Structure formats: structure tokens, C-alpha cells
Amino acid sequence: MSIPAGKNEMPAIHPGEILREEYLKPMGLSAHALAKALHVSPSRINEIVREQRGITADTALRLVRYFGGDAQSWLNMQTAYDLKMAEQDKQSINIIIPLSTDARNVEL
């Protein structure tokens, strides 16, 4: 499920949606079959395709070994999604008082 974006922004897309829609469905592959092929628990893949769990480095490497491609792409998708989700909670971020400009220039 994509998270709606603001004006001129791309929506946040969970990597599980990509896995489900671009890999599993077109190939007629079930989450359970993929889990078996990747030697991981079925719950891991099910949670990813249901967008309830993120892609880890380990999962990215396993997906790339099976499907081909680039592990960094899977991790970048996850990071982009995580950032979009975090940005939606601006209220908790906006209460942080930034370090003053003068203090930022001090070497530690």
C-alpha cells in the first residue's frame, strides 16, 4: 500500500508492495514458496508482502541471490519508505530545538 504524498512528491512505497506486485504475482509465486526458496521462515516473507515488516540486509541479499539485481536497491527502497513514514510524524520532530549555529561550528 502506497502512502499518499504531498504536492510534487512521490508516494512512499513499501518494498513489500514491489516484491508482491513486481515479482510474486507475475511469476505466480506464493510467499510461502519464496520463503522456502530463500531458506527463511514463511512469516518473514508474509509480513514483508503485507507491508508489516521491512527488508533487512539479509533479506535483500537473499532476494538478489534468487531473483538477481542489486541488494542496495532493496535497501534504498526500504530507507526511502522509512524516511517518508518518519516525516509524517513531524510534530514529534518539530519539538526538537536545533543546536545553535554557533555551537555547531565548535569542534568536539
From Swiss-Prot:
Boundaries of every HTH cro/C1-type domain copy: 19-74
InterPro entries xrefs: Cro/C1-type_HTH, Lambda_DNA-bd_dom_sf, Toxin_antidote_HigA
PROSITE patterns noted in UniProt: HTH_CROC1
Gene3D superfamilies per UniProt: lambda repressor-like DNA-binding domains
GO molecular function, one term: DNA binding
DNA-binding residues (ranges): 30-49
Sorted UniProt keywords: DNA-binding, Virulence
Top-rank lineage group of the source organism: Bacteria
Family: Belongs to the VapA/VapI family.
UniProt protein name: Virulence-associated protein I
Annotated source species: Dichelobacter nodosus (Bacteroides nodosus)
Gene: vapI
